Amino acid sequence: MALVVMAEGKAKYVFYFIGDGMGVNQVNGTETYMAAVEGRIGTSPLCFAQFPYVGLVTTYSGTNGVTDSAAGGTALATGNKTKNGALGIKSDLTTRINSIAALAKSEGKAVGVTTSVSVDHATPASFYAHVKDRNMYHQIGKDLIAAGFDFYAGSDFLQPENNELSGNKDLYTQCREAGYTIARGYADYRKKAKKADKMLLLQTETANKADRTSIPYAIDRQKNDLTLQDITRAAIHFLSQKDTDGFFLMVEGGKIDWACHANDAGSTINDTIALADAVEEAVAFAKKHPDDTLILVTGDHETGGLTI
C-alpha cells in the first residue's frame, strides 16, 4: 500500500512516511474505531487515506516470502531486495547499495531520517547503514554519523558504547565531533536549533530511564513526552532553514509493528493515529508549497494478521 500527494513536475520537498507493520487492515481498523468514537458505524478516513493517488509496493525479501523490517526497509529505501536482517546491502551481504536519502544528499538536498523508536533500528537504518545484521547497533550508529545527514531523530541509540572495542569513543562523543548538536526533547530542540549545523534529536534522559528503545506509545503518552508529531515538526523546521535545494525527510511510525506483535489493538490504533498526526504536519507544509511537495505514506509490511 502506498498513498501519494504528487508535486507538479520534479519535487523539491519529499516526505516519506513509513508505518512499520501497517497494512491496509491497520488503517481500516483505525478508521473504523474513529467512526465509532464519533458515534456512528462505518469509517472516518485518516488524512493520508484521502490522498489522490494509491498504489501497491512489494517488500518480500530476496530470500523469504515473509520479509522483516530490515529487508523491507531496504526495499523501500533502495529499491533492492536483500536477505532478512540485512541493511543497505544486497543478498550477497557484501555489495553496498545507496538509499534514496543518500542520493538526495548527493544532489544537494538536506536530509532527515526520523522514527518513534531508536535511531539505529531497522527501518531508519535502511536509509543510511550498510550491515549484514540489523542487530549490529553500534556499527549502525557509526554508519549514521558517516552518512552525514542533516537531521536524525528517535528515542536514542541502543548501543552507544561498544564494549568489544575498549577505548572506543561512545556514539554521543563521535556525533559531537562530527558536528552534530544533540537535543534532548522538543523544548531542548527549540533552544538549540538556530545555532546547530546538524541535529540529533533524542528523548529526555528521564524518558530514557523508563524505556530507551522508543518514545512512549501514543496511548501511554505523558505531558512533555516526545511525540512523532513533534519530531516531524522539528525536522521540517530544521531542514527548511538549510540553504539547500529542498529536502528529503523519512518519518517512521515504528511502534505500530510492536503493538501488533503484542496483539494490542488499542496501541496499534493510537500509534496509527499518531502517524497520521505526523502526516498532517507535512500536509500543512504542502499547502504552503503545493507545486513542489511530494508526500508518500506506506508500510514496510503488515504485522499480526489483524482482522475485524
For the regions a language model picked out, list residue spans one by one.
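Phosphate/oxyanion-binding active-site loops and adjacent basic polyanion-contact surfaces
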Residues: 133, 224-232, 271-275
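N-terminal catalytic scaffold of extracellular/periplasmic and nuclease hydrolases
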Residues: 8-193, 197-198, 302-308
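Metal-dependent active-site segment of extracytoplasmic phospho-/sulfohydrolases and closely related
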Residues: 276-308
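Beta-strand elements within well-structured catalytic alpha/beta cores of enzymes
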Residues: 12-22, 104, 202, 246-254, ...
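Hydrophobic h-region of N-terminal signal peptides that target proteins for export
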Residues: 1-7
